[in-house]
Amino acid sequence: MLKKTLLSLTAVSMLASAGSALAAEYKFDKEGQHAFIEFRIKHLGYSWLYGSFNDFDGAFTFDEKNPSADKVNVTINTNSVDTNHAERDKHLRSAEFLNVTKHPQATFTSTEVKKDGEDYDITGNLTLNGVTKPVKLDAKLIGQGDDPWGNYRAGFQAEGTIKLKDFNITTDLGPASQEVELIIAVEGVRQK
């Protein structure tokens, strides 16, 4: 009986580790500019102000059959913030907002990925302005397949919302401007 139990536990353990081994690793396609990290925030409640981070890197693992094995890691150079307005960008880099001198990077590391119908719920830790908080992103697989250059690609779009005060950004922008919407679109190249 003990021998059968040990064999069963060994088989289950091997199957579990085999599932995580099937998750393929993808690196963000930065060379072809097929990855974007954008944000928007309400301006006085009258309109949207859009911006992006132009310097970042990341990778993810993806296994459609076992999403719980998937991982996402992103590193953002906060100095690369760009809202198409030099003075505003300078202000956003200051200690009142991103404090890029003290906190030159923001990071996101997933802690859990779940399939939700055709979509994915990605939960992870976002570190921004020296503060780490859990964040949930709603992601969609846009497509995947072989490219003309002999690689295999997968593309996703993820969206989420963060509260500025959660990341110690307390500059008063008015009641309509307390949250930032994140839009992340990435195309990953599967590593061989």
From Swiss-Prot:
NCBIfam families: PRK03757.1
Intracellular or extracellular location(s): Periplasm
Main location: periplasm
Signal peptide: 1-23
Keywords: Periplasm, Signal
The name this protein goes by in its record: UPF0312 protein PC1_2518
Organism of derivation: Pectobacterium carotovorum subsp. carotovorum (strain PC1)
SMART domains in alphabetical order: YceI (SM00867)
Cited InterPro entries: Lipid/polyisoprenoid-bd_YceI, TTHA0802/YceI-like_sf, UPF0312/YceI
Recorded family membership: Belongs to the UPF0312 family. Type 1 subfamily.
Entry superkingdom: Bacteria
A single cellular component GO annotation: periplasmic space
